[in-house]
């Protein structure tokens, strides 16, 4: 069943091929904006790199949260999901996975290319990419809760960011922390285990919390 | 209050009350629907028909009273109830970007009954959409979209259908078609609860009229 | 009918109970505040390192403690409300949020005020300060989510979920000083170790903490009473109250 | 007539009081995120400050573009606007103005407070605020064109950023340029005149271009 | 082709053609509607009724043929045409977050006829929404939302009304009400073009039936 949801969401994304590309472009543009705003000194850019990439990934992921449930809500599909004999948590998990596939994966693949622009050393590039690989699914999973809670509320698009950003911050801190630790020549294993722990916890709790939020929002 | 599964399947509502804002839409509403029976829910605009249907399918909770399926509270049944029930609301759950076939297959899968491409095309043909199966729903006319949503009734195997104004936007031929589909389900021992502002004469089956005011 | 009686009776009886308790807690708050402020400004010695500026500690630390404590309490009651559908506990949770946000703001503000003489800057992006800021955002998120939802039942439940999810931040704030090396002071008051500071300072801080605690209780009870009146305005007992029957 | 539109949009914003606050909080949160990603050294932060504040303002303004026409489109109000005897350009101007009032003005007011956190000197703060005051209306006006063009396209929320960001970049460059010029002790008058020119040009052309885009999108 | 303003106001369509995808919905369609006349556009689902109405009000362009108002092509008239015409589509243009009164006042202002609070409340009362004026549209029932949209017909001073399935979701009483409103407009010399799948018997006025197939 979960496959149906993933298949459908990917189908919808593909129907507008621009959809996948656009999140990616957003990410690329935001990352490229900073050198414009800050100035071109390479030393400063190198320090900023991981932070900027991570913040851009976070914003790209957050930006697309609005779409996660709202169109299903507007056209009545969500009602049908709530009435489906299939477990709502499974459906929600499917939606979070396809959200990650559409928004997270392209970012992870693109990150090394952008890192090069900021003159990052190879090891830092690898660590950055891996940290995004571990971190972006957490963003989608946590984001699902926020998206479900703000469903149907006007200004939800921005309200969701208030709810979700504070929860994203720990991911951001450990994600960039890993890169900085590796640049400083220290071990980044601890950061990765914490990111991994975040991922496990959110896999376990987020579908459940999201399903509960959806039932509340639709009640 | 639960009395164990009764031998015949039936939906029973006891002393339902529904309050919206300052208005008490209805209270002390009790009825039951047996296999092969159709219940029309009538009443003027805003009398609470949609609200009642949403209670019956478990989308919202009554302010008072209980709803039983085979003698068990539907809240306790959860998935078991959703397994035997189909709800079609004002909104069709039709995605603009998907074709009619994709829409039908996905909405069926969501309802727990997976069908393949041919079955879907077949159902769409029966409901008068032959030749439009591969069009994205965005370009379909209002009545055609409605038909895509209703096509689910042709493939679902659920007993209890709860339909909120299913005839909206349909032309005369389609109304007859839907009538046939409903009669078929009732003849098989199914149950239908529906609202409509249009007249729909069904002589061969037991029809209840519940009028809210 | 019996079920109804239970459902509606508990906020009503809480309303009157709270009404009776408020004066006692107010008096306690005032007494603790006077004693605490006296110790803070007259009795406690001037710090040999920090001079007089350190006296901010008597507001800063109790406010910071309270901000975290109230969040946990709020999440607890909200969670109870979600799990057992007890409306009163959800109302209490909503009543706690503004006070909690106020103390978080106070901790941030007094901290910033203190930071200027101590660290030479209003603000640094260190882990504890940042996580306290996140706490502020969590309170704001909780309140704006509830404000955005018209139906109080839905608002209660939605707020409960975000409050519970946000609880993960509390250990992060508390342990941030240990996990990252920061500019901010580590914990000097702990249940396991004996305190490292002067007795007058410690007692002043603890008494101020009690004062802040009592104040919070008073504010929460007052706000909870208002919320109850607002939510129960259609029930018989509130209309009787309006007509003065129960006075 | 234009007043009706402004009044209506402000009314809609006020109906959910959180709406105005949320854009603001988004702005505050984004500005607060960067130091987390980049690290707390004050010297680096001071260099980044104007860039970060401007980029955040830009993102906050862009994020809310989605809402500018999409709800009017979904519920049929836009159809009615196209059929209205009132000039569409005037209606569009009204919508851009209310967008600015709801999203731009709070940012301008908030900017100095955030600048203090980044330890900016007073003159730089004033220049930053003034540059935002001149720049944010341009963002709303340009954004309107993008929002109109992407109307009804799935993934429009992200597509709009691709269209609009390149046009935002000149504003960003001159906005931050003004702050940097003032920090460097040079005159910032030239930057301000260019920003002013942008504003005039966009006031003249944007309503017209937006109206044309709307007619195309609805065709 | 323009023949200067003719003495009487009328809407004329000449040789209209509309192609959607592979389908030619209609072609060589000509008709005219004179003051006091009502035209029903009928036909099965997907036959092109909505498409025709959107051509007539200028929201989209015909693939062939012209539409004249008083002898002038409506594309040339622009604002002058929009000044005398009211279109109500499937979508009501009703904002969930605004109250019924606010919705009505704003949609009227958009249509170029500003009304004050009392007039709006009055119109809503007439259309059966007394007591619901201050509710946000979100909580209104389907039929009540529709009524809010239709209330505009009570205050507008335009001649030509183009209505796409105005009777959807309305109860019997409301259908009568709308019938009265239409008759009033026709009696004043107005014109109405509308689609509907429901029967609507109007004896006192000149009625054309245009059936697409
Ligand atoms: C905006 C800036 C600040 C924030 C957000 C902040 C936050 C906090 C928090 C959350 C606590 C309670 C944690 C605990 O009990 O372990 C705390 C305690 C404390 N803060 Fe701050 N603080 C700030 C600035 C400062 C400054 C500038 C100083 C002095 C140099 C300071 C000194 C202390 C002390 C001494 C404690 C008590 C620690 C203890 O004894 O447990 N804080 N602060
Ligand atoms: N928060 C609220 N405050 C006041 N009234 C409300 C509120 N929510 C809903 N209502 C009222 O409750 C009723 C809901 O009716 P419902 O949608 O069930 O009607 P219906 O019988 O389906 O009508 P229709 O035939 O128009 O579809 C409406 O009259 C609406 O005005
Ligand atoms: N791009 C397209 N490709 C193929 N067919 C299309 C396309 N766009 C529209 N159509 C068809 O054109 C017709 C549009 O009909 P329209 O919406 O005008 O019908 P209608 O008479 O209003 O029907 P209803 O009674 O259902 O509202 C539909 O049959 C639709 O399938
Ligand atoms: Mg209804
Ligand atoms: Mg149609």
UniProtKB/Swiss-Prot annotation, chains B, E:
Domain ABC transporter span(s) in chain numbering: 11-213
EC code(s) of this entry? 7.6.2.5
Query: Keyword annotations for this protein?
Result: ATP-binding, Cell inner membrane, Cell membrane, Cytochrome c-type biogenesis, Membrane, Nucleotide-binding, Translocase, Transport
* Residues the record lists as binding ATP: 43-50
GO BP terms: namely: cytochrome complex assembly
Q: Which GO terms describe its cellular component?
A: plasma membrane
Q: Which reaction is the catalytic activity of this chain?
A: heme b(in) + ATP + H2O = heme b(out) + ADP + phosphate + H(+)
This entry's Gene Ontology molecular function terms read: ABC-type heme transporter activity; ATP binding; ATP hydrolysis activity
Task: Report the PROSITE patterns cross-referenced here.
Answer: ABC_TRANSPORTER_1, ABC_TRANSPORTER_2, CCMA
* Family affiliation: Belongs to the ABC transporter superfamily. CcmA exporter (TC 3.A.1.107) family.
Name by which UniProt lists this protein? Cytochrome c biogenesis ATP-binding export protein CcmA
User: Which organism is this protein's natural source?
Assistant: Nitrosomonas europaea (strain ATCC 19718 / CIP 103999 / KCTC 2705 / NBRC 14298)
* Designated gene of the protein: ccmA
């Amino acid at each position: 069943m979960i496959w149906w949801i993933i298949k459908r969401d990917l189908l919808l994304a593909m129907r507008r091929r621009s959809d996948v590309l656009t999140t990616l472009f957003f990410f690329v543009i935001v990352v490229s904006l900073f050198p414009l705003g800050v100035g071109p000194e390479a030393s400063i850019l190198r320090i900023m790199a991981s932070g900027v990439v991570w913040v851009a990934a976070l914003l790209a992921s957050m930006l697309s949260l609005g779409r996660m449930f709202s169109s299903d809500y507007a056209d009545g599909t969500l009602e049908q999901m709530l009435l489906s004999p299939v477990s709502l948590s499974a459906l929600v998990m499917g939606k979070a996975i396809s959200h990650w596939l559409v928004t997270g994966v392209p970012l992870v693949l693109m990150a090394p290319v952008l890192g090069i622009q900021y003159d990052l050393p190879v090891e830092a590039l690898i660590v950055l990419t891996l940290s995004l690989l571990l971190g972006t699914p957490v963003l989608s999973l946590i984001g699902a809760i926020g998206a479900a809670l703000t469903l149907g509320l006007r200004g939800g698009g921005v309200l969701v960011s208030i709810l979700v950003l504070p929860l994203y911050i720990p991911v951001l801190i450990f994600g960039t922390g890993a890169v900085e630790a590796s640049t400083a020549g220290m071990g980044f294993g601890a950061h990765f285990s914490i990111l991994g722990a975040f991922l496990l916890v959110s896999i376990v709790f987020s579908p459940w919390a999201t399903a509960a939020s959806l039932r509340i929002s639709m009640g | 209050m639960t009395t164990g599964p009764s031998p015949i399947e039936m939906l029973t509502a006891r002393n339902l009350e529904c309050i919206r804002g300052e208005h008490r839409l209805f209270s002390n509403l009790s009825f039951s629907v047996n296999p092969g029976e159709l219940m029309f829910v009538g009443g003027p605009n805003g009398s609470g028909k949609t609200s009642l249907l949403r209670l019956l399918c478990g989308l919202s909770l009554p302010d008072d009273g209980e709803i039983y399926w085979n003698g068990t509270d539907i809240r306790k049944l959860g998935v078991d109830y959703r397994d035997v029930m189909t709800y079609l609301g004002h909104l069709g759950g039709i995605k603009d970007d998907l074709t009619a076939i994709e829409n039908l297959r996905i909405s069926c899968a969501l309802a727990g009954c997976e069908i393949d491409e041919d079955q879907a095309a077949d159902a769409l043909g029966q409901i008068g959409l032959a030749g439009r199966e591969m069009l994205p729903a965005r370009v379909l006319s209002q009545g055609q979209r409605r038909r895509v949503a209703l096509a689910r009734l042709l493939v679902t195997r659920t007993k209890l259908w709860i339909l909120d104004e299913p005839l909206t936007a349909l032309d005369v031929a389609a109304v007859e078609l839907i009538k046939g589909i409903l009669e078929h389900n009732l003849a098989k021992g199914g149950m239908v609860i529906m609202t409509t502002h249009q007249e729909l004469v069904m002589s061969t089956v037991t029809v209840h009229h519940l009028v809210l005011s | 009918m019996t079920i109804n009686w239970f459902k509606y009776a508990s906020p009503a009886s809480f309303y009157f109970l709270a009404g009776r308790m408020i004066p006692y807690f107010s008096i306690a708050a005032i007494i603790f505040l006077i004693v605490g402020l006296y110790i803070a400004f007259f009795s406690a010695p001037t710090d040999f390192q920090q001079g007089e500026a350190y006296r901010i500690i008597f507001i800063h630390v109790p406010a910071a403690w309270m901000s975290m404590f109230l969040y946990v309490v709020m999440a607890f009651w909200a969670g109870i409300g979600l799990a057992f559908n007890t409306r009163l506990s959800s109302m209490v949770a909503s009543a706690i949020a503004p006070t909690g946000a106020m103390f978080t703001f106070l901790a941030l503000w007094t901290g910033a005020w203190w930071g200027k003489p101590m660290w030479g800057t209003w603000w640094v992006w260190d882990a504890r300060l940042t996580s306290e800021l996140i706490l502020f955002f969590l309170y704001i998120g909780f309140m704006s989510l509830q404000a955005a939802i018209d139906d109080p039942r839905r608002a209660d439940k939605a707020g409960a979920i975000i409050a519970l999810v946000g609880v993960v931040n509390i250990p992060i704030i508390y342990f941030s000083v240990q996990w990252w090396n920061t500019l901010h002071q580590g914990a000097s008051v702990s249940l396991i170790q004996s305190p490292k500071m002067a007795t007058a300072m410690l007692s002043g801080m603890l008494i101020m903490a009690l004062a802040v605690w009592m104040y919070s209780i008073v504010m929460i009870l007052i706000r909870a009473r208002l919320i109850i009146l607002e939510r129960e305005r259609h029930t018989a007992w509130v209309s009787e109250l309006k007509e003065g029957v129960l006075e």
